[in-house]
Amino acid sequence: VLRAMAGIVLSLVLMACFLQGAHLFYAGDYVLPISLANAAQLDLLLTAPRVAALTAAFTFLVTIEWLVIGRGAIINARFRWGLALVLLISGIGLQAFVIKNSLRVSPAEIDLTSPGRQVLGSPLAELIDVTKKVFREHKKNQALTEIELNTAARFGISIDQNAQFPLIKPNIYTSPPPLEVDGESGSFRKYNVIVLLSEGLSSRVMQPYSQDYPGLTPNVDDFSRTAMTVDNYFNHTFSTYRGLHGQTCSFYVYFGGGSVIDSASYSCIPDILRRHGYVSSFFYSQYNERTQIDEIMQRAGFDSIYDGKHLGDDYLSSEAANLEIGLSDQQFMKAFIGHLKSAETTQKHGDNDPFYFSLYNIETHALRHPAEDAKRYQGVNSYVLDTIHNYDDTFGQFWRYFQSSPYYDNTIVIFTADHSRFYDRDFRVLVEHQSDYRPIFVDRMPLLIYHPSRELAKNFDANYASSID
């Protein structure tokens, strides 16, 4: 019995250390609540080398456990106890190294100029703690702890967790809007709208916001010459499910964001525009069976939803998908342009209802390497920059087509992101030299708006507003 109990304890400790160590290596932090909340999307990150590494590590752990507590006659008790002692000392040493070198930003002390810090604790204890937090978020009125509520209060945010909508805002503006709207007495021309909710982009590496990596996003930079560039604009939530749903509906999504609360009564942008005669469609590159985006965006009110398979079948002929989960960014934009071309005739004659289109790509996702058809960045050897440069190339294809299309004079184009870039190791090495960068999942995002009237300001300071505003 004691041997079995020892085996269970050792298994838990080893697996916790392995899991926390892997997460620490890639993300610079132990497993986070958002990681567990999005565990169903793990396949986005499982490349062949990572699967091989995970398999090798798991095999090693099982072998070590058998050597320490196994009953095999070929291993004597003295050797097993000696190995156990070595593992114990190594574990203590590793933990000391982690505590000394792996400091994280404390959520209670977030400050863009002087953040507080706190050390990492025991791998097993912290894994248990984060698991408790995730289960607590499933319970009504327990999504936030007292510490988190007090932190919100420090920033002037009052949260009543007993309310149906704890963060409801009773008004949009208390003073005149900063940007005027066409028309008088609330009337306006019904422009089409295309919104690119790009996967995980932070503006700090992109032109026109930054010149740290010249030529990284030349097409977005070119777009900015015609569009209004918004600065100091931050994400209000994360990750993808929360970002897509939260921005479309202007709210904070419950828990991981993958579950849809049908009983809640709220209207989103497609619902509001429908009352003014708009039709809405959402386009994304993944296959619907690999994600919950279909269900989420249906609840957000979109009339039609096109996943990677639908777009591939309709606009890419027999071309095979370049990603195991769907279309590459190159294929996705090619298919979307094909969709726009198919409706050009009605646009020219004005025989159609105004539309609201929203797009979501996948290749710029944290820890994902570019597909084989990607266009690589020639400045710095980094797969992170490759994915951003490749996505910019696809946007350039869209923008060049758009400027010569019937949509140019009747369609608003908004380029932004679902949330900022996650602070994974490979991104941090690119930006940690910037004095205002902090390894937290909140950062400045790109926001550029093209309006056919060409009357928007060249630049606009959002003054630290977020995507919920």
Describe the predicted segments one by one.
Residues 64, 128, 140, 149, ...:
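Intrinsic-disorder/low-complexity regions
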Residues 1-137:
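Transmembrane and membrane-interface helices of multi-pass
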Residues 162-469:
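Solvent-exposed soluble domains appended to multi-pass membrane proteins
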Residues 83-89, 156, 165, 409:
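Low-complexity, intrinsically disordered short peptide segments enriched in small/polar/basic residues
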Residues 94-190:
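Membrane-interface segments at or immediately adjacent to transmembrane helices
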Residues 45, 130, 134, 154, ...:
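Residues that form generic nucleotide/phosphate-binding pockets
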